[in-house]
Amino acid sequence: MWFHDEIHEIKRGNKEVWIGRSPDCLATFTSRFVSRQHARLYFEDGAYYLADDSTNGTYIQNDDGETFITKGKVIVKGSGVISLGVPLDHSESDQIHFFIG
């Protein structure tokens, strides 16, 4: 995944990766729409997941279309963009791009 000109690789054996406003998160954002521990990415049972633990939800756009989740999880596959708390067309600077292959 990449964001803010940084690239981070999440491998199958890695623990979960947190995304949010907290400085403890791997991907940190300052938007008021992003929760302190907004979402986490992890590998489980042969697939990558994004689990949303936020107030405002997470938008994911990939090869299958756009999905909105809040307080739930979704399989992340292919390539695409993740936006925290606001629709993708409102958050160009705070987007996370991903490729799973």
PLM features: what roles do these ranges have?
Residues 20, 51, 61:
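Residue-level detector of conserved, well-ordered beta-strand and adjacent loop positions
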Residues 1-3:
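A short beta-strand micro-motif
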Residues 11, 40-42, 49-51, 75:
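Well-ordered beta-strand positions
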Residues 46-47, 81:
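Generic structural signal for coil-to-beta-strand starts
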Residues 14-44, 89, 94-95:
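Short, charged beta-strand/loop "edge" motif centered at a coil->beta-strand transition
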Residues 12, 54, 60-101:
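C-terminal boundary/linker segments immediately following FHA domains
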